[in-house]
Structures are given as structure tokens and as C-alpha cells.
From Swiss-Prot:
The organism's taxonomic lineage, starting at the top: Bacteria, Pseudomonadati, Pseudomonadota, Alphaproteobacteria, Hyphomicrobiales
Disulfide bonds: none
Protein name in the entry: Peptidyl-tRNA hydrolase
Purpose: Hydrolyzes ribosome-free peptidyl-tRNAs (with 1 or more amino acids incorporated), which drop off the ribosome during protein synthesis, or as a result of ribosome stalling.
Organism the protein comes from: Bradyrhizobium diazoefficiens (strain JCM 10833 / BCRC 13528 / IAM 13628 / NBRC 14792 / USDA 110)
Enzyme class: hydrolase
GO process terms (BP): protein quality control for misfolded or incompletely synthesized proteins; rescue of stalled ribosome
Catalytic activity, as annotated: an N-acyl-L-alpha-aminoacyl-tRNA + H2O = an N-acyl-L-amino acid + a tRNA + H(+)
Keyword tRNA-binding (UniProt): yes
């Protein structure tokens, strides 16, 4: 069994924020693969289904970003899911818009959602880093992540979430490099990434 966690903030006010791209990704996984209706539990919302041969629980913590770890710990504990079987989908400032990287363990790069999760379950979970780009200076970061994607961004955001959902079974299977490459090729096919980009860490 796998636990896929999308990070974001709850409520319509935040729904299209850059910080919420993790929510957007798991919403698309649920939609594309016919997962169960979302239900409220574990200080969040869950949906259940299968990706390939793996049973997968999707989780969107509704604790607000900075306390996401409480929800993740509760869900992982209930289902007896080890940190190595937890995958977190989150926004990544240090990657250009639309680029994806997958890593297991490591630092949190200043991401408060990851900080909370690491404090509750340790560092040994998988992260799917969804590039949103950096505003250029540190002082603008807070406003950048908590503002909505521009209309001009809608096409690449939709393409990215669609590609992540289409190839999500590869993450469930543990073939991270193949997943990242397939997502990269899907983005490249729509003209959103250049040929020298790749999805490897």
C-alpha cells in the first residue's frame, strides 16, 4: 500500500495558489484513475484506489501547509504505511515552471510543509518536486507561492498535472526515473520544456 500526499492549503481562497499544485496533482490522479469520492478524516481528505497493482491512498491535509505532518502521521499510522511508501507532491521554487524532480530523503529546502512532515515521520519519504519557478529575490517568495497562477500558466499547469496523473503508477511501482522522464517528455511535446531538461535528480 502507498500513501500519496498532495500539499496545499484548504479552501477556495487558496485553490489556484502556486503553493497548492500538490493538491492539484492528486486531484487529477483521483479523477483520471476513478478513485473513490473524497472523504474527511485524518485531519484531511482521502480518496482510495489502485495504480497498476498497488493500492494507493491519496491524502490532502486540511491542517494548512505548516501542520501537514500531523495529518500525514495520522494516516500513515492508521494504514501502517512506512515512510518509504509515502510520496509527497509539492511545489518547488528551485525548479523552473513545469519541471519535475523526484528524490527520496534529503533536506526540505525551506518548505514548511516538508518541514512538518519530516518532524512527524522522519526524512525517508519520496518527494515529487513540481517546479513553480522562483520570483528572483527572497523577499518576494511568500507572495509568489500564495498568489494564484497567472492565466498564462494555466496550460502548462494542466499539462503537468495530467502527465503526473497519467504516469502515477510508475511512482507507485518505485520507478522514479522513468516517471520523471515520461512527465518531462509530455511537457516537452507540448513545448513547455527544452530538450536539454530531464527529470533525473
Amino acid at each position: 500500500m502507498r500513501l500519496f500526499v498532495g500539499l496545499g492549503n484548504p479552501g477556495a481562497k487558496y485553490a489556484r495558489n502556486r503553493h497548492n499544485i500538490g493538491f492539484m496533482a492528486v486531484d487529477e490522479i483521483a479523477r483520471r484513475h476513478g478513485f473513490s469520492p473524497w472523504r474527511r478524516r485524518f485531519q484531511g481528505e482521502t480518496s482510495e484506489g489502485a495504480l497498476g497493482t498497488e493500492r494507493v491512498i491519496l491524502l490532502k491535509p486540511t491542517t494548512y501547509m505548516n501542520d501537514s505532518g500531523r495529518s500525514v502521521q495520522e494516516a500513515a499510522g492508521f494504514f501502517k504505511i512506512a515512510p518509504g511508501d509515502v510520496t509527497v507532491f509539492h511545489d518547488e521554487l528551485e525548479l523552473p515552471p513545469g519541471k519535475v524532480r523526484v528524490k527520496v530523503g534529503g533536506g526540505i529546502a525551506g518548505h514548511n510543509g516538508l518541514r512538518s512532515i519530516s518532524a512527524h515521520i522522519g526524512n525517508d519519504y519520496r518527494r515529487v518536486r513540481l517546479g513553480i519557478g522562483h520570483p528572483g529575490v527572497k523577499e518576494l517568495v511568500h507572495g509568489h507561492v500564495l498568489s494564484d497562477f497567472a492565466k498564462a500558466d494555466n496550460d502548462w499547469v494542466a499539462t503537468l498535472c495530467d502527465a503526473v496523473a497519467e504516469h502515477a503508477a510508475l511512482i507507485a511501482k518505485g520507478t522514479d526515473a522513468t516517471f520523471a522522464n515520461r512527465v518531462h517528455l509530455a511537457m516537452q511535446a507540448k513545448g513547455f520544456l527544452t530538450k536539454d531538461d530531464n527529470g533525473k535528480e
